């Protein structure tokens, strides 16, 4: 009996493979593909982290677009700016604006109903409108300026305590606390990190769950494209369901707290006012999905970008000195840098742009899916094919960038050449599904980085180069979290201590 339980599903899967893949090869002119492909598994055994570097190596062999079969899923990988532009402009941008259906999207993202996971259509357009006009609009972000300023001062005071005793600081956790507090306060009004906070355990659980999402989303776990694995005891779906249950309970508690505070000035309180006008559409699930999307997309990625920027500056002390000089000349040591100053700090902006070029938080953009058959680069891309764009490879294309492996913020000074154009950056995506929170991310990253440089002198813990190796997952972490030494600059002696750290 056991043999039939094992053999029958495998036989059915092989028949499906024969029908859906082998027969269709005769009809489609597919992009080039690695020759090493196994029945059922396809190219699964080729996939090793970091995926963006693997895809870059494969593109050097097979060209700027190539085809993969990941178990039951088709995928194409794009590694050139021109082909990415072909995907993300005109009618193609509509056809390639769906999302693949993953287990994480089904269970954690409320059955594919969040802005990041739902397919293109009326529901997505409405969510996008809500985000752009009601949640991350310029007016709404201006209302939360005091939060961003307070959280910056909280971080600076925390760092100054370590700096005064010459303590080595680990920046990853400090930066995550900064960005997470920023986002959650804007969304719900709650503070998770600080001396007077009693919910640090819940905050750490949120961090653990968000890391689970970014590590396992986007076809990074074989359980997403080898569904038969659960027959052999694969536990991925159970793990996703368990994580989804905990996340939903935590989001519901935050939502209930906002409901009880009817005078609150948060993103959720604004969504609750929309719920009163249209309760059938703005359900608790829709609101929790928006909360989840903003918190996952904004907190970790911003922290990682600041960390990569600091690591790059520590490895390039002359660049660090130059951006420090710019801040000192424009702002001085009598007041803290503010968001309104950023427009007058072009070199600081260049440093952020160069960091996003070399170390995009999502090196392979969130996968899209084709709504119908389409041609890309002259090749057939069938319906329901995952389309993955390797932003990391495009950002290091020697046809687009001068000395692409070199950290060089001066490249964005606005010369007349055809290369080094900041408009070629796609760190936040492109087309219809570009990240709606890009403006907020730039504000948090640039202000935080400028504040760290203005208020402290930084140096490496030893003479060795900072290890710039990359970790696995959808969000590109440093393999070795950044540690550094800092010393307070005169401005910190003029600022009152922010006690609620």
UniProtKB/Swiss-Prot annotation:
Membrane topology of this protein: Single-pass membrane protein
Keyword check for Transferase: no
SUPFAM superfamilies linked to this entry: Cytochrome P450
Enzyme class: oxidoreductase
Major location (coarse): membrane
GO cellular component, as recorded: endoplasmic reticulum; membrane
GO biological process per UniProt: indole glucosinolate metabolic process
Pathway where this protein functions: Secondary metabolite biosynthesis
Subcellular location: Membrane
Ubl conjugation found in the keyword field: yes
EC numbers on record: 1.14.-.-
Keywords: Heme, Iron, Isopeptide bond, Membrane, Metal-binding, Monooxygenase, Oxidoreductase, Transmembrane, Transmembrane helix, Ubl conjugation
Cofactor: heme
CDD domains: CYP81
Residues engaged in binding heme: 435
Alphabetized InterPro entries for the sequence: Cyt_P450, Cyt_P450_CS, Cyt_P450_E_grp-I, Cyt_P450_sf, Plant_Cytochrome_P450_Monoox
Family under the similarity heading: Belongs to the cytochrome P450 family.
Function per UniProt: Involved in indole glucosinolate biosynthesis. Catalyzes hydroxylation reactions of the glucosinolate indole ring. Converts indol-3-yl-methylglucosinolate (I3M) to 1-hydroxy-indol-3-yl-methylglucosinolate (1OH-I3M) intermediate. This hydroxy intermediates is converted to 1-methoxy-indol-3-yl-methylglucosinolate (1MO-I3M) by indole glucosinolate methyltransferase 1 and 2 (IGMT1 and IGMT2).
Name the UniProt record assigns to this protein: Cytochrome P450 81F4
Species per Swiss-Prot/TrEMBL record: Arabidopsis thaliana
Gene coding for it: CYP81F4
